[in-house]
């Protein structure tokens, strides 16, 4: 299921709403954030599955007292408002259960459970927020692998072991990439990659004391090699191997990892992409190599106005910085331990799209408001920052938003797919004026006047309008291969 910034409808359900308002929501049918249950005389056990599912996904509302007739296709006829017989007792029973041992944690406040009534019909609403990543998973019973649920358009489903493991890992304040990989040593480091990194490091940090260290000691300082003081184990960390390792050891330990860059700037019916970088046996497919091979190609067509700072030429703009920042964010926030870890960049004439494995730690609307969480891979973040790539912690996405706003472009679109467990950031270089012009166009009368070149804005219209509508309600928010067969993992 995809989530974007405007996914806040379930938070509109409150104790002050009218019966007719709630009825309208019910008549639109169940959705990823709305679950209806009959619940005539007691709280159904399935309520706690939905509670877990909403808390572990994007939040939502459970409405008790609604019967579903699955034979009817029209939602207005499918969902019948029957009401509950004793709402006071039902609410009391729910609170007693949720605060007992039924679930591992109660995340609700008093105002999250309320009744909405009219005449002789009373419905009970349970509003479940998305839980903090430091507290997930929320599960039934005492076994997270049996009692953890997530949510999609079809309802609640048992979370996979990979999804549960991912939630448990996200609770670790130290991140993922400090994990010592047993039996992986300095022999698994690609010397050329590390040498290239150290050369950049020395140029940027000319008098740094680390420049005199041997490779092992240097990696120790960066978090790429570690010794566990408790048991004496030592070896490469996940950060060290993924950033600087040889391709074969990486593919052995992380067979789930797939890196893919595609340029779709010049495409035809027969050619899906005009340039591509993915593993082809000609380069050691570690993250630093991927970053340094892709970045020049990704930025090659951007305008570079001639400017001087003193006698030094400045040949990149804030847009270059924002796109590179998006690349860094993709690397440092990725969950490389998911069952499918795809790092994908798609370049088009007017957009860049970055996809990484793992769900967001924070709700999307919080991220747009400036909220930030620690990256999953803080050592990788340090490695990139020490050679000039990546802003300080928490400032990357706000910087991208500010730069796109300064250029008058459509708001960057951050999307979370909680079924594929991946996040996508799309940076579209189309002006808001173009979006508004298309939106105001009378398609029936002026269809022929709209040129094919302008049709490129169609795909961002809905996204932009959704984001704009939310801003009105929330003003405070401020190997390089050519045309070969595609081997996408999807």
What do the predicted segments below correspond to?
Residues 322:
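Conserved N-box helix within the HATPase_c
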């Amino acid at each position: 299921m995809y989530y974007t910034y405007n996914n806040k409808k379930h938070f509109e359900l409150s104790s002050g709403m009218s019966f007719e308002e709630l009825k309208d929501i019910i008549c639109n049918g169940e959705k990823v954030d709305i679950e209806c249950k009959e619940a005539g005389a007691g709280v159904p056990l399935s309520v706690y599955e939905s509670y877990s599912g909403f808390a572990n996904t994007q939040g939502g509302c459970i409405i008790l007292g609604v019967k579903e007739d699955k034979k009817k296709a029209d939602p207005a006829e499918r969902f019948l408002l029957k009401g509950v017989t004793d709402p006071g007792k039902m609410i009391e029973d729910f609170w007693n259960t949720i605060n007992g041992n039924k679930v591992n944690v109660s995340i609700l406040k008093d105002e999250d459970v309320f009744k909405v009534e009219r005449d002789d019909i009373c419905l009970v609403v349970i509003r479940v927020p998305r839980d903090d990543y430091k507290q997930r998973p929320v599960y039934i019973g005492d076994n997270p692998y049996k009692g953890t649920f997530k949510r999609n358009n079809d309802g609640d489903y048992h979370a996979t072991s990979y999804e549960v493991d991912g939630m448990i890992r996200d609770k670790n304040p130290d991140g993922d990439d400090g994990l010592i990989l047993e039996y992986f040593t300095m022999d698994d480091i690609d010397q050329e990659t590390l040498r290239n990194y150290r050369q950049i490091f020395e140029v940027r940090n000319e008098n740094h004391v680390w420049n005199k260290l041997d490779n092992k000691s240097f990696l120790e300082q960066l978090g790429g090699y570690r010794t566990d003081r408790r048991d004496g184990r030592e070896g490469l960390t996940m950060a060290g191997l993924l950033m600087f390792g040889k391709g074969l050891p990486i593919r052995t330990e992380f067979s789930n990892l797939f890196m893919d860059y595609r340029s779709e700037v010049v495409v035809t019916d027969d050619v899906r992409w005009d340039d591509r970088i993915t593993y082809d046996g000609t380069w050691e497919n570690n993250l630093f190599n991927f970053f340094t091979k892709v970045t020049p190609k990704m930025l090659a067509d951007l305008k570079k106005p001639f400017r001087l700072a003193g006698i030094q030429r400045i040949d990149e703009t804030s847009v270059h910085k924002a796109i590179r920042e998006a690349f860094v964010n993709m690397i440092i926030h990725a969950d490389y331990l998911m069952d499918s870890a795809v790092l994908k960049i798609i370049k088009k004439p007017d957009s860049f799209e970055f996809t990484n494995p793992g769900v967001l730690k924070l709700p999307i609307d919080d991220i747009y408001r400036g909220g930030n969480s620690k990256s999953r891979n803080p050592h990788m973040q340090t490695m990139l920052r020490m050679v000039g790539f990546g802003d300080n912690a928490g400032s990357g996405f706000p910087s991208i938003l500010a730069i796109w706003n300064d250029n008058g472009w459509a708001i960057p679109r951050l999307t979370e797919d909680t079924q594929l467990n991946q996040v996508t950031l799309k940076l579209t270089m189309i002006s808001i004026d173009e979006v508004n012009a298309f939106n105001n166009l009378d398609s029936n009368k002026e269809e022929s006047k709209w040129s094919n070149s302008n049709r490129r804005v169609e795909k961002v219209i809905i996204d932009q309008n959704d984001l704009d509508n939310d801003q009105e309600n929330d003003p405070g928010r401020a190997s390089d291969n050519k045309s070969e067969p595609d081997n996408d993992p999807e």
